[in-house]
UniProtKB/Swiss-Prot annotation:
<dbReference type="InterPro" id="IPR036485">
    <property type="entry name" value="Glu_synth_asu_C_sf"/>
</dbReference>
<dbReference type="GO" id="GO:0016491">
    <property type="term" value="F:oxidoreductase activity"/>
</dbReference>
<comment type="similarity">
    <text>To M.jannaschii MJ0658.</text>
</comment>
<protein>
    <recommendedName>
        <fullName>Uncharacterized protein MTH_238</fullName>
    </recommendedName>
</protein>
Length: 306
């Protein structure tokens, strides 16, 4: 069905779309990582199937603070990197304000990966893993409301969290969800503690802060880490520390294969791991020992990869 533009009672401009079934990458600010495929997987100026709006029109509408209502189900990667001012598309590489995405049905996996601002409302079910988001108390009857972890920690909470504890400088998550990209683009001296496993790219593009996972992590943990500390109190899948730039990645277990691939800086401390050039194993420094002890870990169990 065709989409149309209208207004809600709060005077926010609204686009309504009713796609042909669950469509992936609606409101995806990366257009399914466009720089990797140059339009072969998703053309930003292609119409969303069954609607009169393109993927780009939806993203630009959200950048302007508007609302997008999906009349039906949504596919994978809804609102990916929402609020990221991506340098590849001419942005400054930081964070911008974003609008609202509302889904009248269910949402498939990886909703809100690397999301840094904006709000998502969902009437139906949401499949794990989810992204860098938590549920907060909803102000719309019949809808669940989700906000960015990074946004809350950097700009303050504007709603009561669900199964999440907030203390000064700390967020403790224990809601049973598996997450991708936890702590994405975090740039504040705060701590995130996540009880349970996480999946892809924990701490991606972090600059400051600490993310501590009380469980195992998936691939690409610490990818593009640019500062701060990521602590995994368990094992990681492969490619930990890929393209890492700065900071510490600490794995209290096995950091996996292809450790530190394309690493430009930073330090990986792990009990075990199989590095690839330019990363290699070396002795712990005094700074490494101090960091491990401050994290409550035993330095003699760890190896340095840098």
């Amino acid at each position: 069905m065709f989409g149309f533009l209208g207004r809600r009672r709060d005077e926010r401009e609204v686009i309504e779309i009713e796609p042909d079934g669950p469509v992936d990458c609606i409101a995806d600010f990366t257009y399914n990582f466009y720089w990797q495929h140059r339009g072969e997987k998703l053309d930003p100026d292609e119409r969303i199937p069954g609607t009169s709006h393109t993927f780009r029109e939806v993203v630009e509408h959200l950048k302007d603070g508007g609302e997008v209502i999906v009349r039906g189900d949504a596919g994978h990667r809804l609102a990916s990197s929402m609020g990221a001012d991506l340098a590849y598309f001419g942005g400054g590489g930081g964070v911008m304000d974003a609008g609202v995405v509302t889904v009248e049905g269910d949402v498939d996996t990886r909703m809100g990966i690397s999301m840094v601002s904006g709000t998502i409302y969902v009437k139906g079910a949401v499949r794990d893993p989810i992204g860098n988001i938590i549920e907060v108390r909803s102000d719309r009857r019949g809808y669940k409301k989700f906000m960015s972890v990074t946004d809350i920690l950097m700009n303050g909470l504007r709603a009561e969290p669900v199964n999440v504890t907030l203390e000064p400088g700390r967020m403790v998550i224990d809601d049973g969800h598996v997450r991708d990209t936890l702590g994405a683009r975090l740039d504040a001296d705060v701590e995130i503690i996540h009880h349970g496993n996480v999946d892809l790219s924990t701490g991606i593009l972090m600059r400051r802060g600490t993310v501590r996972v009380m469980g195992d992590a998936g691939k690409n943990t610490g990818a593009l880490l640019s500062g701060g500390t990521v602590i995994i109190q368990g094992d990681c899948d492969d490619f930990s520390g890929i393209d890492m730039r700065d900071g510490y990645l600490i794995v209290d277990g096995d950091a996996g294969k292809f450790l530190g691939a394309q690493r430009r800086g930073g330090v990986i401390l792990a009990r075990r791991g199989k590095p690839v050039p330019p990363t290699s194993e070396s002795d712990l420094t005094e700074d490494d020992r101090r960091v491990l002890m401050e994290a409550g870990l035993r330095p003699h169990l760890f190896r340095r990869f840098s």
